[in-house]
C-alpha cells in the first residue's frame, strides 16, 4: 500500500514538474522570442538608418556637384569636366562619375565617351534632362566590374534652365558599409548579395538562396534560428528595402540560448529536490500511521481461512480503529450465522428425506394412471379411425352415385339428340329419294332429246353425202362446196358418236339412281328400327336413374351418421389426450420436484461442507 501511495505521489510530482517546466519553458521561450525580435529589429533599424544616411549623403553630394559644374557643363569645358569627374571618383571611390550635356555628350572620370546618352535613351538621362526629375536606379550588376551598382542622377540647372545631368555610379558596399556592429547581408530582388559585413564578405556577388537555403522562405518581420558547425546559435530576419532590395540581419543569440537552458535546468533540479524531500517525509508518515495494517491483514487472513477466534480489542489511535471494530462485529455476527446454519441444515436434511418418499409414491401412482389413459386413448383413436373410414367409403359411394346419375342424364340427352338427328336423317333421305326420282325423270327426258339429236345427225349426214355427190357432178365449180359438205358430214358423224356416248352415260345414271332409291328405302327402314331401340333404351336409363338416386340417398344418410360418430370419437380422443397430457405434466412436475428436492439435498450437503470450513475457537 505504501508503495502504491509513493508511486502515485511520484507520478503526481512528475506531472506537476512537467507542467510547471512546460509553463516555464513557454514563458521563457516567449521572453526569448521577444528579446531576439527586439535585438533583430533594433539591429535592422540601425542598419537601415545607416543605409538611408549614406543614400541621403550621396544624393546631397550629387546636388552639390550639379551646382558646382553647372557653368562648365553649359560651356562644355571638356578637360575641366573630365578632371572634376576623375577627382570625385578618386576622392569617394565611386565606380563611375558621369556629366551629361543637353545633347547627350558624356564626360566621365575616364574621359569623354564615344556614345551618346540621349541617342541611347538612357533612363537616368531621360528622367533628369527631359523630365527634370531626380532619379536613382535599383542595384544592377555592372557588366564591366561585375559589382552591384546604384546610379544616382540629378538635373543640372543654370538659373531655371536645365543644361545637363550628373550621374554617380556607387557600389553596394559603399552605401551599406561593412563596418559597425552586427552581421548583415543586402541582396537585390533576385537574392544576389551586393553588401555584407566582413564575416560574410565572401558571399558578395553570389546567390544567397543557394549558399543559405534557409534564408529563402523568410517572411518580413519574423526571424529564424540556426546554428553553425560549432553549435553556435544565431537568429536571422528579413526586411524589405525600397520595395525591391532585401536586408538580412543576423544576431548572435548564443548567450540567450545558454541562459534559457540554464534556467530550465535549475527549475527541473529544484523541483526534483523538492519532490525527494516530500517523498521522504511521506514515507515516514505513512510508515507510522499504517503500522496497524499488518495486524488487520493477519486478522482478515485468519477469517478467510475459516478460523474464528476471540481477540482482544486493538487500538491504533487513527482511522484503522474503525476497521478493527468493524472486523470484530463481523466476527461475532459470522459466529451466530455459522451456528444457526448448522442447526437449520440438520432440520432441512430430515424434511428433505420425507419429501423424497412422498414424491416417489405420487410418481408411481401417476405412471399407472398414465398407462390406463393411454389404453383408452388408443381404443378411442381406433374407433375414430374406423368411423372416418366408414364416412369416407359412404362419401365415395355417394360421389360415385352422383357421377352415375350425371352419366345417365348425359346418356339420356345423347339418346334424345340421336333420335332427333335420326328423324332429321330420315327426312333428308326422303328428300334425297324424291330428288333422285326427279333426276331419273330428267334422264329419261334427256334420252328422248338425244334420240332427236341422233335423227338430226343422220339426216345431216345424208344431206352432206348428197351435197358431195352433187358437188362432184359440178366439177371444178363445186369443189369448194364439196369441201364444206365434207366438213358438215364429218361434224354429223362426230355429233352422232357424242350422242351415243351421252346415251350410255344417261343409261348408267338411270341405273345408279334406281340403286340409290333402293338403298335409301332400306336406310329408312333401318332408321325406324333404331328409333324403336332408342325409346326402349331411354326407358331403361330412367329406371336406372331412379335406383341410383335411392342408393345416393342411403349413402348420404350413412355418411352423415359416420361423420357425427367421427366427431364424437375425435372429441373423446382429444379429451383423453388432454388428460394424458395433464398426467404427463404431473409426472414431469413430480420428476422436476424430485430433482429439485435432490438438488436441495445436494446443496444442503454442500452448505454443510462449506460451513465445516469455519472452525470456532472460544477462549475460556
Swiss-Prot record:
Gene3D superfamilies: Methyl-accepting chemotaxis protein (1.10.287.950), PAS domain (3.30.450.20)
UniProt GO cellular component terms: plasma membrane
Keyword Glycoprotein: no
Keyword Glycoprotein: no
Membrane topology, from the record: Peripheral membrane protein
Every Methyl-accepting transducer domain range: 344-580
Keywords, comma-separated and alphabetical: Cell inner membrane, Cell membrane, Membrane, Methylation, Transducer
Parts forming coiled coils: none
Similarity comment text for this entry: Belongs to the methyl-accepting chemotaxis (MCP) protein family.
Role noted for this protein: May function as an environmental regulator of TCP biogenesis. Negatively regulates the synthesis of the major pilin subunit of TCP (TcpA).
Protein name: Toxin coregulated pilus biosynthesis protein I
Organism: Vibrio cholerae serotype O1 (strain ATCC 39541 / Classical Ogawa 395 / O395)
Taxonomic lineage of the native organism: Bacteria, Pseudomonadati, Pseudomonadota, Gammaproteobacteria, Vibrionales
